[in-house]
């Protein structure tokens, strides 16, 4: 433990105070952190840490101090408040409860924190629960592993952390948020509530009212009600009689209501109070209007059928019998007027842009007026509303539009067009119904009377009393002839008509009301019809017969007013004759000004698309008009013209289309550069995402000036690489794999899928496809070339994993360069690694405890953690495979095959351990009888002590280096996050945003993390080797203890032998050779017959020792014999271990150099990618700053 008297120092401070408090705290042994550290030390895989963003902790205040004069920053709580720390650490190994919704399959899990509070995690949202003062709902930003570099947590331990958008205690921002804008209350809300009330609803809502009047209304509306039989009989009668009968019924209905509150009625008082209550509930309600509409509702079918019957009677004597019932607009008249054009109605408007506005109003007015024929319109109020809306469309200006003057003549002309083209049967009956069956008395309503008078005027215009009616029919006939000839591709007919016109107007302009200038209600002229017909001869006959007939303004301003598509757009969409398109473009380029050309080619339709969005229909136009196109203009789907070109997947000349489009864009924006961020759609797709093929032709990756992020994720968290694999775009895949900026193993921040996951998804659909196999080979070969040692003759890689619900275990997918692949469950893999270590107990192969240190085997956890954990475990598997290619102690070929083959017969672990133990014993026995002298053991001991000291020094220095690399990785992340924050806040579009984009959404791992893993792996191998050396040193110490025990026993035995034997022995020893036995070995002993030891009267011992000495001698001999057996076994063990360790040391010295070199190469490669990525981001920033100047 660190002494409190010494000056305390620690590594560079982490930017996130919470992480710094837990992992870089020199006061970890003091409160409030001591208890937390003790619990995390015990089993760190059981816990997950919830980490708020750094800027929240550094800038926000504790909510409990909101009303205090001295507010406390949240970062202070990280160091001084144990409750705060414990509240952000959850025990994910033992959830309180876990439920899964049956339909969405979302899992909701409740966890306890270290201080027994509770949180709920559902759909990546964290909800505070029991124990928390405030109920909060926080989004999870990302899930990561944090590598601990401190000394008070287990070495090489990794902690799972979840970045959340704020603390579980909340936080007060440094500046007050602006209050939300007050909601604009609808002033007519009460009116809308009243309008929604009907008498029928009141009857359903108030049973007392229904009881008072429903029976009487039922009898009133019954078909057997003889009192009002006139409406039931379909015979000829005047419309005034129908109106009179309706008024009688209406008065009867009013009487029913008044009788219900009559004093003679026993329930009158209750009914009266109820009606007053209803009036108080809906202030301003008109009960008379409700009753009127109720009567209409019940009698509408009868009334309407009577009106239709009367209007459809022959008009022979109606002039005298009932002039109101004359039917004017019959089906025949509608047919004769069906091709009537607005320009033939003598309105005082002739400018093409104003005519477009009027045509749009007419088209919208027709759509609205047609609602009169809808079967749902069943009362006078609804019919009146339709008429009002139609007049509003025809007369009121829309925002941003040019406002033509709508005088009386213009309005009549618009109404004529609306009534003729809406073709409503019995329009006269509708107008009569609106006038005479209305629930509101409109006698003094000027607007209503003005509208009705205009409708009457239009009807009068079509009557035989108006001479202009015949002119309208004649104009419609002429329009029909030319339109029909064009649509039917009748060139001869068109030519004959044009010849007649040419004879009449040889060198002059056509009058405004001429049929060649006619348009339908959508604003489409003969020229538009010719373009849609796709016949150049007809088009040429119309536009080139006489240049005076169709001025340039007519071409520039002609469009379909409903789609807002001009002539060129329609020509491209209809894919008309290329000669028509070329001629139309030439006319515009030769006759319009540059400003007019730019406006024309960039005007947008209702989808927000310009001509540029439709150029894929004729991409050769790009060379003509591409320089006039705004390639950055987005449509309603956020697609630019260039984006639309890239999405035209079924184009027969797709590559040429891409080449033409991009070359034009580079030529136009070459000086300032192309801003590729403006070509991103609302789903986050970049041009690289949507491009089907032709990356070389687009020059997006090859042009060094292009600021393209090849790793950008769309809103579905797919990078271009993932898209190419998912949708089998082999050509693009090959190209992007050659880009040095590619983050090949990058994972998305939502599902944590990488390219191999999407490869496996595609494999389920198209495993037999040749294209897919090529994609699979390209991806795997890229991995081997860039992430696996190239010198290796054997290889295997763990690619991805899937969860097997049946086995309730993860299956890891392995594959080698020869194409062999297999799935292995984690349990099976754990057994394989365990048995390998049993077979090679003294090798540097990682032990079970070391390898699975950061993977909580068998620990249940939320699905949102699974993918992150398994991805990091896959990384460890690949490190294992990479490391083995630099080692010789383990048979690589045999080891790799165990992951690629499926055993047909499974063997229990117990049987496998037995066989391995027997094999190890056999290997040791094969060494034969092994004897060691002390000097030999001392030589081995010296070698081991030297190696141990050397490796301990190396381990100490390497551990410090690994720690610095680890902290360097964390500081890399801090620097990146701080720079991201600065760039975000310096951006003019986000500087005033209250909503902050958290840096923690991104992957919180630096490039030094790659080097760290290799340092850790070498460190783990070194620890295994140190452990083996220490074990052998321990065996040698045991051997020496046995050796000295034998020496001691030999000394005692010599003292018990006869004197002359001892003297002789001393004489022999004096010759210069130190022997410990008669066979010149301390491990030898002369066998003594037992009968000599047992018989007191026999043998030389009986002459000078007593019975007690005999027993002790026997005991020493037996003890020596046992020690000799043990030391002989230990000799075998030492020799076997010594040879293995010597080989392992040699192998490790080579391994640590080569593997570290490979790791450094990997780090440098990732660092270069990161620097290029950051360079692109900063260059974009500079580009935008310069562009804004």
Curated annotation (Swiss-Prot):
Organism encoding this protein: Candida albicans (strain SC5314 / ATCC MYA-2876) (Yeast)
Protein name: UPF0507 protein C2_02840C_A
Transmembrane segments: none
Lineage: Eukaryota, Fungi, Dikarya, Ascomycota, Saccharomycotina
GO MF assignments: guanyl-nucleotide exchange factor activity; SNARE binding
InterPro entries on file: Ankyrin_rpt-contain_sf (IPR036770), UPF0507/Ank_repeat_27 (IPR051248), VPS9 (IPR003123), VPS9_dom_sf (IPR037191)
Cellular component GO terms, alphabetical: early endosome; late endosome; plasma membrane; transport vesicle; tubular endosome
Residue ranges of every copy of the VPS9 domain listed in the record: 321-471
Gene Ontology biological-process annotations: early endosome to late endosome transport
Family membership: Belongs to the UPF0507 family.
């Amino acid at each position: 433990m660190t002494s409190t008297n010494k000056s305390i120092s620690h590594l560079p401070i982490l930017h996130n105070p919470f992480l710094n408090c837990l992992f870089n705290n020199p006061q970890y042994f003091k409160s409030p952190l001591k208890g937390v550290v003790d619990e995390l030390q015990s089993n760190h895989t059981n816990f997950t840490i919830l980490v708020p963003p750094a800027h929240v902790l550094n800038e926000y205040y504790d909510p409990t101090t909101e009303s205090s004069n001295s507010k406390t920053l949240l970062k202070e709580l990280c160091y001084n408040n144990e409750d705060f720390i414990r509240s952000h650490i959850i025990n994910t190994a033992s959830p309180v409860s876990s439920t899964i919704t049956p339909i969405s399959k979302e899992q909701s899990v409740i966890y306890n924190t270290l201080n027994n509070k509770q949180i709920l995690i559902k759909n990546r949202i964290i909800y505070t629960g029991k124990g928390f003062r405030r109920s909060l709902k926080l989004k999870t930003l990302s899930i990561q592993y944090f590598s601990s570099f401190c000394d008070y947590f287990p070495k090489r331990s990794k902690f799972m952390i979840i970045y959340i958008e704020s603390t579980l205690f909340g936080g007060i921002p440094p500046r007050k948020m602006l209050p939300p804008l007050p909601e604009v209350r609808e002033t007519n809300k009460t009116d809308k509530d009243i309008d929604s009330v009907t008498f029928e609803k009141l009857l359903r809502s108030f049973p007392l009212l229904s009881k008072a009047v429903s029976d009487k209304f039922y009898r009133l509306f019954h078909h057997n009600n003889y009192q009002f039989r006139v409406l039931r009989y379909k015979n000829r009668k005047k419309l005034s009689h129908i109106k009179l009968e309706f008024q009688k019924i209406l008065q009867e209905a009013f009487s029913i209501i008044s009788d219900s509150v009559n004093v003679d009625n026993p329930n009158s008082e209750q009914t009266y109070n109820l009606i007053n209550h209803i009036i108080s509930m809906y202030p301003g309600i008109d009960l008379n209007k409700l009753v009127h509409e109720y009567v209409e509702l019940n009698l509408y079918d009868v009334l309407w059928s009577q009106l239709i019957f009367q209007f459809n009677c022959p008009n022979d004597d109606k002039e005298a019998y009932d002039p109101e019932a004359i039917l004017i607009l019959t089906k025949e008249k509608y047919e004769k007027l069906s091709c009537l054009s607005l320009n033939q109605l003598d309105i005082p408007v002739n400018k093409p842009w104003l005519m477009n506005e009027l045509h749009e109003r007419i088209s919208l007015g027709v759509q609205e007026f047609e609602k009169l024929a809808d079967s749902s319109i069943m009362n006078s109020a609804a019919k009146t509303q339709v008429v009002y809306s139609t007049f509003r469309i025809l007369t009121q200006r829309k925002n941003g539009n040019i406002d033509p003057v709508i005088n009386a003549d213009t309005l009549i002309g618009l109404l004529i067009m609306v009534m003729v083209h809406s073709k409503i049967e019995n329009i006269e009956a509708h107008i009569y119904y609106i006038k005479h069956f209305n629930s509101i008395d409109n006698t003094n309503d000027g607007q209503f009377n003005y509208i009705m008078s205009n409708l009457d005027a239009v009807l009068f215009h079509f009557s035989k009393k108006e001479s202009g009616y015949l002119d309208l029919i004649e104009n419609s006939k002429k329009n029909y002839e030319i339109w029909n000839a064009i649509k039917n591709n009748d060139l001869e007919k068109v030519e004959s008509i044009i010849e007649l016109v040419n004879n009449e107007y040889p060198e002059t302009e056509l009058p405004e009301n001429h049929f060649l200038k006619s348009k339908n209600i959508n604003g489409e002229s003969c020229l538009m019809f010719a373009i849609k017909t796709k016949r150049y001869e007809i088009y040429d006959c119309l536009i080139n017969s006489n240049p005076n007939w169709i001025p340039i303004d007519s071409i520039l301003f002609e469009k379909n007013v409903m789609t807002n598509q001009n002539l060129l757009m329609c020509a491209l969409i209809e894919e008309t004759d290329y000669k028509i398109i070329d001629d139309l473009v030439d006319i515009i380029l030769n006759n319009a000004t540059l400003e007019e050309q730019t406006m024309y080619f960039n005007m947008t339709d209702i989808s927000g698309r310009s001509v540029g969005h439709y150029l894929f229909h004729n991409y050769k136009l790009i060379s003509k008009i591409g320089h006039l196109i705004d390639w950055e203009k987005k449509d309603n789907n956020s697609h630019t013209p260039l984006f639309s070109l890239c999405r035209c997947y079924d184009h027969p000349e797709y590559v040429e289309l891409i080449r033409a489009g991009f070359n034009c864009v580079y030529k136009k924006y070459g000086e300032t550069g192309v801003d590729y961020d403006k070509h991103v759609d609302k789903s986050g797709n970049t041009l690289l995402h949507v491009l089907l093929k032709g990356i070389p032709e687009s020059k997006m990756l090859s042009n060094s000036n292009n600021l393209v992020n090849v790793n950008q994720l769309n809103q579905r968290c797919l990078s271009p690489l993932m898209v190419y694999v998912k949708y089998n775009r082999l050509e693009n895949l090959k190209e992007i794999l050659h880009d040095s900026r590619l983050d090949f193993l990058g994972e998305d921040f939502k599902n944590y899928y990488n390219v191999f996951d999407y490869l496996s998804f595609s494999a389920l659909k198209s495993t037999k496809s040749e294209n897919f196999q090529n994609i699979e080979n390209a991806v795997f070969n890229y991995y081997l070339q860039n992430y696996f040692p190239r010198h290796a003759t054997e290889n295997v890689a763990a690619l991805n994993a899937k969860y097997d619900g049946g086995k309730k275990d993860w299956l890891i997918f392995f594959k080698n360069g020869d194409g062999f692949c297999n799935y292995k469950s984690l349990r099976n893999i754990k057994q394989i690694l365990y048995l390998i270590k049993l077979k090679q107990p003294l090798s540097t192969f990682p032990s079970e405890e070391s390898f699975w240190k950061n993977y909580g085997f068998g620990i249940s956890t939320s699905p949102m953690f699974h993918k992150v954990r398994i991805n990091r475990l896959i990384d460890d598997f690949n490190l294992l495979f990479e490391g083995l290619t630099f080692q010789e102690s383990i048979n690589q070929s045999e080891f790799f095959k165990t992951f690629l083959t499926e055993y047909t017969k499974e063997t229990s672990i117990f049987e496998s351990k037995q066989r391995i133990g027997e094999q190890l014993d056999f290997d040791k026995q094969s060494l034969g009888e092994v004897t060691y002298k002390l000097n030999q053991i001392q030589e081995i001991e010296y070698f081991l002590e030297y190696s141990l000291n050397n490796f301990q020094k190396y381990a100490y220095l390497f551990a410090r280096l690994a720690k610095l690399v680890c902290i360097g990785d964390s500081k890399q992340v801090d620097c990146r996050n701080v720079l991201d924050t600065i760039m975000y806040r310096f951006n003019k579009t986000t500087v005033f945003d209250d909503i902050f984009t958290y840096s923690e959404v991104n992957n919180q791992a630096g490039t030094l993390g790659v080097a760290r893993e290799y340092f850790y792996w070498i460190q783990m191998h070194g620890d295994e080797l140190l452990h083996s050396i220490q074990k052998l040193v321990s065996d040698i110490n045991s051997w020496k203890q046995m050796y000295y025990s034998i020496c001691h026993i030999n000394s005692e035995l010599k003292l018990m032998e006869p004197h002359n034997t001892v003297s002789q022995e001393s004489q022999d020893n004096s010759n210069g050779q130190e022997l410990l036995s008669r066979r010149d070995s301390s491990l030898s002993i002369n066998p003594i017959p037992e009968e000599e030891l047992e018989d007191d009267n026999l043998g030389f011992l009986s002459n000078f020792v007593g019975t007690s000495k005999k027993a002790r001698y026997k005991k020493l001999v037996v003890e020596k014999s046992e020690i000799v057996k043990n030391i002989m076994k230990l000799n075998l063990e030492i020799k076997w271990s010594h040879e293995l360790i010597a080989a392992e040391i040699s192998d490790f010295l080579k391994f640590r150099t080569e593997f570290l070199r490979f790791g450094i190469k990997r780090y440098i490669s990732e660092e270069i990618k990161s620097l290029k990525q950051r360079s692109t981001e900063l260059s974009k920033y500079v580009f935008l700053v310069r562009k804004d100047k």
